[in-house]
Regions:
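Glycine-rich flexible loops
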Residues: 1-161
Length: 161
């Protein structure tokens, strides 16, 4: 073992945390808590825009369900208990008083149904993202950091709220 490897191993923290578990081992409750916390983090970072944009997480298992925010709530109002569980067809699968934004469902169901390794999907409305999206030519890869997105950006026509 190299000296660097020994230092890394010596500084390793054995903390039992849901963020360090294998995704397949996470319970729905843990995913709800993490997703609600993620909504608050996105709000804190200034990446939210009113009620628009969505964060979703796929629930492990054969049912192909995922959690999404209730339509009409601001990001800082989303809680673990008011997240809505839906299937890939947009059906709400547990009793709730909330609806789901159809545009959010369209975007996230497309990703969750086609990318089995995309456990969590984020669609935000940052100022920088909205500015880029308004450009006729879309994302221009003019520097090193932008090159990470070369041939990796997909566009979807707006289907309305």
């Amino acid at each position: 073992m190299s000296e660097l490897d020994a230092k890394v191993k010596a500084n390793h923290l054995d903390i039992e945390s849901s963020c360090m578990k294998n995704y397949e081992d996470l319970s729905e409750k843990e995913l709800r808590i993490q997703l609600a916390a993620s909504y608050r983090l996105v709000e804190e970072l200034g990446w939210s825009f009113l009620i628009f944009g969505h964060l979703t997480v796929r629930i492990p298992g054969p049912d192909k369900h995922f959690l999404i925010n209730p339509y009409g709530l601001m990001y800082d109002e989303v809680t673990a208990s008011n997240l809505v569980k839906i299937d890939l067809q947009g059906n709400i699968v547990e009793p709730t008083d909330w609806e789901v934004n159809p545009a959010g469902f369209i975007i996230h169901s497309a990703v969750h149904s086609s990318k089995k390794d995309a456990h969590c999907v984020m669609h935000t409305h940052t100022n920088a993202g909205m500015a880029m999206a308004s450009l006729k030519q879309g994302l221009i890869n003019i520097d090193f950091s932008g090159s990470a997105f070369h041939n990796r950006v997909a566009y979807h026509d707006f289907d309305g709220v």
